Curated annotation (Swiss-Prot):
Enzyme class: transferase
Subcellular location: Cytoplasm
Gene Ontology terms for molecular function: ATP binding; thymidine kinase activity; zinc ion binding
InterPro entries with a match to the protein in the record: P-loop_NTPase, Thymidine_kinase, Thymidine_kinase_CS
A cellular component term, taken from the record's GO annotations: cytosol
Descriptive protein name: Thymidine kinase
Keywords from the UniProt entry: ATP-binding, Cytoplasm, DNA synthesis, Kinase, Metal-binding, Nucleotide-binding, Transferase, Zinc
Gene3D superfamilies documented for this protein: 3.30.60.20, P-loop containing nucleotide triphosphate hydrolases
Family in the record: Belongs to the thymidine kinase family.
UniProt xrefs under Pfam families: TK (PF00265)
Organism per entry: Enterococcus faecalis (strain ATCC 700802 / V583)
Length: 194
């Protein structure tokens, strides 16, 4: 029976590497998958899933108006799995449509993304995945400044932490760091020694 999975973690926890690994494992067995990502993620181009270690694949971009249920239902083949990167940028209706893909089409959906933003608030997509997912899995990484588990994302501008601003700000290692709770509230500057 198909399930809706939400695999979340702080920045730099290997979410994109994991999604690309899952896609590879299915496809190596001649089991087609559909790889999707938020159309808001433009770091390496719209419709690209790119890891920090250089792995990259094309994906179907999801925009505000995209009906993902209809998109998957209208395919000429039935994929073995739907894989979604940057799912924190999804809207409530996207998450419900992914749940329908699982329940009505019996296709597993694995969604990968951040749980909380740099203000330590839930993203809309993450909020509804936490509510509707059948399985939750935390992908772990360590704090940029110590050895504890990172559960939060710290945003830096010009080497200084920032706690206010628009929720959606696309950036990579240069702007966001995985941190533990202690270093979220009492951060070091990014130039300080670990």
């Amino acid at each position: 029976m198909a399930q809706l999975f939400f695999k979340y973690g702080a920045m730099n926890s290997g979410k994109t590497i994991e999604i690309l690994k899952v896609a590879h494992n299915y496809e190596e067995q001649d089991k087609p998958v559909v790889l999707m990502t938020s159309g808001l993620d433009t770091r390496d181009g719209v419709g690209k899933v790119s890891s920090r270690i250089g792995l990259r694949r094309d994906a179907i971009p999801i925009f505000e108006e995209t009906n993902v249920f209809d998109l998957i239902n209208d395919l000429s083949y039935k994929p073995f799995c739907v894989l979604v990167d940057e799912c924190q940028f999804l809207n409530k209706h996207h998450v419900i449509e992914f749940a329908r893909i699982v329940d009505e089409l019996d296709i597993p959906v694995m969604a990968f993304g951040l749980k909380n933003d740099f203000r330590n608030e839930l993203f809309e997509g993450s909020k509804y995945l936490l509510l509707y997912a059948d399985k939750l899995e935390e992908l772990k990484t360590i704090c940029w400044f110590c050895h504890k588990k990172a559960t939060m994302n710290l945003h830096y501008i010009d080497g200084n932490p920032v706690y206010e601003g628009d929720q959606v700000q696309i950036g990579g290692n240069e702007a966001y760091y995985p941190v533990c709770r202690k270093h979220y509230f009492h951060p070091k500057t990014v130039n300080e020694e670990q």
